[in-house]
């Protein structure tokens, strides 16, 4: 059943397509998180992402179909200048740090500033402390991380790609927030300005019936 006040776009027979970008330093486990979520795979060896990789996931959340396009970006310093290419038109951003690495948490703050500067408050932010399987080696306090996330309007999560903890909850909650944001835009679009607010973020609201098999084409709306 559509959420109250969700409008016509939340009705049955339609799908949302959202773009999500993962940002963070190298070695914090961004690729491991995405592979665990999309393919339920985990590799103990470090996987280095060169520039960016792209995966998709289809979901049904409360009767609403969601097509996720997930961009996993490189963490190495030499690739940071490419960030705007990948997070442009994103509906959500997952900013990952390693709970055993204080510097990786501080670098997340730089990404938050950049995203807010480039995309304003229209993007849904998640700050994620990964590798909680190494809790005994933690160097980032839970209170500090959660307080910071709240101060910048983000939600904070803890995950372990190795143990498959917290990842489903992270993506599910982010999807719900992106749907809510899109619905606010739909309600605010006004007479005759169809999907104007959603278009600002690159949200695609698709009539599934004539293009039920074309979800992959609608996933990658990077403008």
Swiss-Prot record:
Assembly and partners are described as:
Interacts with the cytoplasmic tail of integrins ITGA1, ITGA2, ITGA5, ITGA6, ITGA11 and ITGB1; this interaction is dependent upon its GDP/GTP cycle. Interacts with RABGEF1 (via VPS9 domain). Interacts with ANKRD27. Interacts (in GTP-bound form) with VAMP8 in response to starvation; the interaction probably regulates VAMP8 endolysosomal trafficking. Interacts (active GTP-bound form) with TMED10; the interaction is indirect and regulates TMED10 abundance and localization at the Golgi.
Segments carrying motif Switch 2: 74-92
Q: Which PANTHER family match?
A: PTHR47978
Q: Which GO terms describe its biological process?
A: anterograde axonal transport; intracellular protein transport; positive regulation of dendrite morphogenesis; positive regulation of early endosome to late endosome transport; positive regulation of receptor-mediated endocytosis; protein stabilization; Rab protein signal transduction; regulation of axon extension
Instruction: Spell out the GO cellular component terms annotated for this protein, sorted alphabetically and separated by semicolons.
Output: axon cytoplasm; cleavage furrow; cytoplasmic side of early endosome membrane; cytoplasmic side of plasma membrane; early endosome; endomembrane system; endoplasmic reticulum membrane; Golgi cisterna membrane
Location(s) in or outside the cell: Endoplasmic reticulum membrane; Golgi apparatus, trans-Golgi network; Golgi apparatus membrane; Early endosome membrane
Catalysed reactions, semicolon-separated: GTP + H2O = GDP + phosphate + H(+)
Q: What Pfam families does the record point to?
A: Ras (PF00071)
Q: Which cofactor does it need?
A: Mg(2+)
In chain numbering, where does the motif Switch 1 fall?
41-54
Entry note about domains: Switch 1, switch 2 and the interswitch regions are characteristic of Rab GTPases and mediate the interactions with Rab downstream effectors. The switch regions undergo conformational changes upon nucleotide binding which drive interaction with specific sets of effector proteins, with most effectors only binding to GTP-bound Rab.
Q: What's the name of the protein?
A: Ras-related protein Rab-21
Membrane topology classification: Lipid-anchor
Q: Where is the lipid attached (S-geranylgeranyl cysteine)?
A: 219-220
- Sites binding Mg(2+) sit at 31, 49, 72
Q: Which residues form the propeptide?
A: 221-223
Instruction: Describe the family membership recorded for this protein in Swiss-Prot or TrEMBL.
Output: Belongs to the small GTPase superfamily. Rab family.
Q: Which NCBIfam families match?
A: small_GTP (TIGR00231)
E.C. designation(s): 3.6.5.2
- Chain positions found as Cysteine methyl ester: 220
- Please list the residues that carry the modification N-acetylalanine: 2
């Amino acid at each position: 059943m559509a959420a109250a006040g969700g409008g016509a776009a939340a009705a049955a027979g339609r799908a949302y397509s959202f773009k999500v970008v993962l940002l963070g330093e190298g070695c914090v486990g961004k690729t491991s998180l995405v592979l665990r979520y999309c393919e339920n795979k985990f590799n103990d060896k470090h996987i280095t992402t060169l520039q960016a990789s792209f995966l998709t996931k289809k979901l049904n959340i409360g009767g609403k179909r969601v097509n996720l396009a997930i961009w996993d970006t490189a963490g190495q310093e030499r690739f940071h200048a490419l960030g705007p290419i990948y997070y442009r038109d994103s509906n959500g951003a997952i900013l990952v740090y390693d709970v055993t690495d204080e510097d990786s948490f501080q670098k997340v703050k730089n990404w938050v500033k950049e995203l807010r500067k480039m995309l304003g408050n229209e993007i849904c932010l998640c700050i994620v402390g990964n590798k909680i399987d190494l809790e005994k080696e933690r160097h980032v306090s839970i209170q500090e991380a959660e307080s910071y996330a709240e101060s910048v309007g983000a939600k904070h999560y803890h995950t372990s790609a190795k143990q498959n903890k917290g990842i489903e909850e992270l993506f599910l909650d982010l999807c719900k927030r992106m749907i809510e944001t899109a619905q606010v835009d739909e309600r605010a679009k006004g007479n005759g300005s169809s999907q104007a607010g959603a278009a600002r973020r690159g949200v695609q609201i698709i009539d599934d019936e004539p293009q039920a098999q074309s979800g992959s084409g609608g996933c990658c709306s990077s403008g």
